[in-house]
Amino acid sequence: MNINKSNLIWLDLEMTGLEPETDKILEIATVVTDADLNILAEGPTIAIHQSNELLDNMDEWCTTQHGKSGLTARCKASTYDEAYAVEQTIAFLKQWVPAGASPMCGNSIGQDRRFMNKYMRELEDFFHYRNLDVSTIKELARRWKPEVLAQVNKKGSHLALDDIKDSIMELKVYREKFFNL
């Protein structure tokens, strides 16, 4: 383990829906990379227990997707809550990055920040206020160099760890093919 302020923290949450006022977090995963996007470590992937009532009332997309991936069943069987997930995730991150140093990295992470602000504030506060949002670059590529998008091959499993790895791979493609670095 090497604590380095240049390391990047990648995070993804899976949720029961898109509204933090009514929906909840189902899963969290983190990955730490160096500044060149090489994976240094995978943090804990934690399925968070949610009530059967909440899980049974997810919208059709979430019910189908999280049922198919096995996430719904993992959440029903889990004994972990948000506080445990925060504690374990911060303990992992402190081994790699000083608090406040890394932007939050991932795809559409503004959404993750909204949920973290409500349910995982201590973890949200661990990040720098800046974001490294791969979806911003995707939107620019769609408009300025759409042929690059065909070179991004994501699994799209909607499991947090897989989604993070997809985001890292996607940014590597953009770095090479869009920014020519």
UniProtKB/Swiss-Prot annotation:
<dbReference type="Pfam" id="PF00929">
    <property type="entry name" value="RNase_T"/>
</dbReference>
<dbReference type="InterPro" id="IPR012337">
    <property type="entry name" value="RNaseH-like_sf"/>
</dbReference>
<keyword id="KW-0963">Cytoplasm</keyword>
<dbReference type="InterPro" id="IPR022894">
    <property type="entry name" value="Oligoribonuclease"/>
</dbReference>
<keyword id="KW-0269">Exonuclease</keyword>
<dbReference type="InterPro" id="IPR036397">
    <property type="entry name" value="RNaseH_sf"/>
</dbReference>
<feature type="active site">
    <location>
        <position position="129"/>
    </location>
</feature>
<comment type="similarity">
    <text>Belongs to the oligoribonuclease family.</text>
</comment>
<keyword id="KW-0540">Nuclease</keyword>
<protein>
    <recommendedName>
        <fullName>Oligoribonuclease</fullName>
        <ecNumber>3.1.15.-</ecNumber>
    </recommendedName>
</protein>
<keyword id="KW-0378">Hydrolase</keyword>
<dbReference type="GO" id="GO:0006259">
    <property type="term" value="P:DNA metabolic process"/>
</dbReference>
<comment type="function">
    <text>3'-to-5' exoribonuclease specific for small oligoribonucleotides.</text>
</comment>
<feature type="domain" description="Exonuclease">
    <location>
        <begin position="8"/>
        <end position="171"/>
    </location>
</feature>
<dbReference type="InterPro" id="IPR013520">
    <property type="entry name" value="Exonuclease_RNaseT/DNA_pol3"/>
</dbReference>
<dbReference type="GO" id="GO:0003676">
    <property type="term" value="F:nucleic acid binding"/>
</dbReference>
<dbReference type="GO" id="GO:0005737">
    <property type="term" value="C:cytoplasm"/>
</dbReference>
<dbReference type="GO" id="GO:0000175">
    <property type="term" value="F:3'-5'-RNA exonuclease activity"/>
</dbReference>
